[in-house]
Amino acid sequence: MEVIYEDNHLIAVDKTCREIVQGDKTGDTPLSELLKGWLKEKYQKPGNVFVGVTHRLDRPVSGVVLFAKTSKALSRLNEMFRLGQVKKTYWAIVKEKPAKQEDELVNWLVRNEKQNKSYAYDTERPNAKKAVLHYKVIARSDRYYLLEVDLK
């Protein structure tokens, strides 16, 4: 686990792919629990350590995850996310050239709880959640394209 920023209120951690942020049905140890142990050891804290999850990244995704170190910080960060005052930007590396240099994609997501997966469809489905994203190609190599992705 790599901590990339820390102050009295929050801590930012570089999440690797295959790690989970919060506990799930798999029983794998989540990053939030690993962080509690790290903080407890680093600061020699007796008793419980507070770590508040402000947002998540899916298991196959790597990136920076922000955690709150106090309940007050968690409340404030949650409010900032709710009001859209925090901007999350994703970068994706893809092999196939996107159809357009920049575009907006609209899909409908259906969650399969038994498989612990979500599926994307081009057309509306019952019980589906509408998902909109905007992407822009920002770099390319001989074989890959780097996209900047913003979820709407």
Feature-to-residue mapping (PLM):
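RNA pseudouridine synthases
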Residues: M1-K152
